[in-house]
Curated annotation (Swiss-Prot):
Organism: Vaccinia virus (strain Ankara)
Signal peptide: 1-18
Site positions (Cleavage (By host protease)): T96, T97
InterPro entries reported in the protein's UniProt record: EGF-like_dom, GF_C11R
Protein name: Pro-vaccinia growth factor
């Protein structure tokens, strides 16, 4: 801990001697006088891009030269020329009221298993109660 205090004291002495000697570094920066205008990263093409994109908007990107298409929903491709085919059965949300109701066949099987199990248990208990005690067999 004493070493940390000595290092801190030594660093403060070096900084003070450097500042007193007149060798201080000027850290102020000159003011910027010319104003810069922000160019949006993506902008619409304008009249030169009319008809370029078949199903979407023609755009210019700031970093890339050329025209590009931002496709409307349901279209894809370089010029939005391809239709995206959607499988409607997979895209629909499941009907929550019917998706959690078990089918009648499954219910019948479960009820049948429960009834058979109850019958077997009752037969087992009945035969266990009425069983005659085993008599010791004596051999003459």
């Amino acid at each position: 801990m004493l070493i940390n205090y000595l290092m801190l004291l030594f660093a403060a002495m070096i900084i003070r001697s450097f500042a007193d000697s007149g060798n201080a570094i000027e850290t102020t920066s000159p003011e910027i006088t010319n104003a810069t205008t922000d160019i949006p990263a993506i902008r619409l093409c304008g009249p030169e891009g009319d008809g370029y994109c078949l199903h979407g908007d023609c755009i210019h990107a700031r970093d890339i030269d050329g025209m590009y298409c931002r496709c409307s929903h349901g279209y894809t491709g370089i010029r939005c020329q391809h239709v995206v085919l959607v499988d409607y059965q997979r895209s629909e949300k499941p009907n929550t009221t019917t998706s959690y109701i078990p089918s009648p066949g499954i219910m019948l099987v479960l009820v049948g298993i429960i009834i058979i199990t109850c019958c077997l248990l009752s037969v087992y208990r009945f035969t266990r109660r009425t069983k005659l005690p085993i008599q010791d067999m004596v051999v003459p």
